[in-house]
Swiss-Prot record:
The lineage of its organism: Eukaryota, Viridiplantae, Streptophyta, Embryophyta, Tracheophyta. PANTHER family: PROTEIN YY1 (PTHR35501:SF3). Keywords: Disulfide bond, Secreted, Signal. Transmembrane segments: none annotated. It comes from Oryza sativa subsp. japonica. Disulfide bonds join C31-C72, C41-C61, C62-C87, C74-C94. This is Protein YY1. The keyword Signal applies. Its main location: secreted.
Length: 95
C-alpha cells in the first residue's frame, strides 16, 4: 500500500513538473528546461573507452544545443567549475 501511494505521488509530481515546464517553455524556456532538452547528447557527453573515437552527435543533439542560450550555457559551466572548491576538491584542469 505504501509503495502504491509513493508511486502515485511520484507520478503526480512528475506530471505537475512536466506541465509547469511546458507552460514556461511556451513563453521563454528556463535554463533548466533548455538543459533538459540536451538528453539526445548524453551518449556523446561521456568519454569513450580508451582508443575509441568520440561518436558523432545525433542531429537532435545539435538542434538542442543550438537552442541553449549563451547565458544558460555559460552559467552552467560556471556552476560546474565552482563545484570542486565548494566540495573541498582540487580544481579540475583539462588539456
Amino acid at each position: 500500500m505504501a509503495v502504491t501511494r509513493t508511486a502515485l505521488l511520484v507520478v503526480l509530481v512528475a506530471g505537475a513538473m512536466t506541465m509547469t515546464m511546458r507552460g514556461a517553455e511556451a513563453q521563454q524556456p528556463s535554463c533548466a528546461a533548455q538543459l533538459t532538452q540536451l538528453a539526445p547528447c548524453a551518449r556523446v557527453g561521456v568519454a569513450p573507452a580508451p582508443g575509441q573515437p568520440l561518436p558523432a552527435p545525433p542531429a537532435e543533439c545539435c538542434s538542442a544545443l543550438g537552442a541553449v542560450s549563451h547565458d544558460c550555457a555559460c552559467g552552467t559551466l560556471d556552476i560546474i567549475n565552482s563545484l570542486p572548491a565548494k566540495c573541498g576538491l582540487p580544481r579540475v584542469t583539462c588539456q
